[in-house]
Every structure is written in C-alpha cells, then in structure tokens.
C-alpha cells in the first residue's frame, strides 16, 4: 500500500494532483486504517518530505509489526526556504534518517532525488547531468541511507519519468 503524505507549509511544494493534509501520519483515523496492514501482511510505502520523517518514526515505533518502506530517501527538500538552508537541511535530514533506521521494520528506497523539489539545478543547464554529476550530488544521501539502514534494508528504485523533470 502506498500513500502520499508529502506535505509542507510552502504551497509551492504541494502537488495539487492529490489531497494531503498536515499531520496525516498521526491522525487517529489514518492510524486505525494503518493498523489493518499488519493483519493483512501488507507493507506500507511512505512518500513524504524530510520534515515529516520524525512523524514516520513515531508511526513505525507504534506499529513494529508492519513493514514500512521510505520512498525517495525521505524526500529531502531543496526549494524555497530549504534552498537557503541546504546545509541545515542535510543535517536535519540525516539526524531524522538515523533515528528512523533504528526501527527494524523500516526499509528505504534509494532514488527519487532527481525531482525539482530536491533543489538541484539540472533543469537550468543546457545539457542533462552526467552520471558523474548525479553520483556526486546524490552520494551523501545514498551513503547516509546505506550506513544507517545497512545494505539489507536498502533497495534501489526508479522514479522515471518524474526524475527526468529536473533535467
């Protein structure tokens, strides 16, 4: 089961194609539905933004029997206020990832960092990024996830064609 919970105060970061509300992961009605997943032996894919990772950690701690898969490395944001605080964004994201990784029922998908919301300026360049440019840009995130979760709880993902939007 995948549910998009990606929400932020900045309206520019909200995808108008779907309805998302603040604090959804803590909502009692959401959690009542979430409780059914373990009974059905279903996993949960979480697509959210990095400021919401701590909410996902709380969910994982309260439902240790449900496998949770964090999509897109936890959605580190790089637009708006987050662009101006990129060093703080990485530090905050990393701290939250390490805390989430302590929950043994959580896995992480490595990918999805090519979206414009991640703040890379690839779409402003004349040519698409090279493999080396992508590897250099994404390495800190992939490395942190692999170190925190271990290789047994990491998986690669494709986010095509959405990632192509940034280049």
Question: Where are the regions that the model predicts?
Answer:
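Weak global preference for isoleucine
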Residues: 1-4, 14, 53, 68-69, ...
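H/E-rich (His + Asp/Glu) clusters that bind or coordinate divalent metals
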Residues: 79-167
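Active-site gating loops and adjacent loop-to-helix segments of metal-dependent hydrolytic enzymes
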Residues: 2-23, 66-67, 74-80, 104, ...
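Generic structural signal for well-ordered alpha-helices
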Residues: 30-34, 56-60, 94-97, 142-146
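Alpha-helix C-cap/termination motif
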Residues: 39-40, 62-63, 103, 148
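Active-site gating/metal-coordination segments in enzymes
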Residues: 1-52, 58-61, 74, 88-89, ...
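Structural preference for beta-strand elements that scaffold enzyme active sites
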Residues: 2, 36-45, 67-69, 105-109, ...
């Amino acid at each position: 089961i995948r549910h998009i919970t990606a929400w932020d105060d900045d309206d520019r970061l909200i995808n108008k194609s779907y309805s998302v509300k603040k604090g959804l992961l803590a909502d009692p009605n959401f959690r009542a539905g979430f409780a059914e997943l373990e009974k059905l032996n279903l996993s949960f894919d979480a697509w959210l933004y990095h400021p919401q990772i701590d909410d996902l950690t709380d969910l994982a701690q309260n439902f240790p029997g449900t496998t949770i898969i964090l999509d897109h490395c936890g959605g580190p944001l790089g637009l708006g206020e987050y662009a101006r605080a990129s060093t703080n964004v990485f530090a905050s994201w990393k701290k939250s990832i390490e805390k989430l990784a302590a929950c043994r029922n959580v896995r992480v998908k490595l990918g999805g960092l090519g979206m414009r919301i991640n703040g890379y300026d690839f779409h402003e360049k004349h040519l698409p990024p090279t493999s080396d440019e992508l590897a250099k840009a994404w390495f800190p995130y992939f490395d942190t996830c692999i170190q925190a979760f271990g290789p047994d709880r990491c998986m690669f993902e494709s986010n095509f064609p959405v990632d192509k939007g940034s280049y």
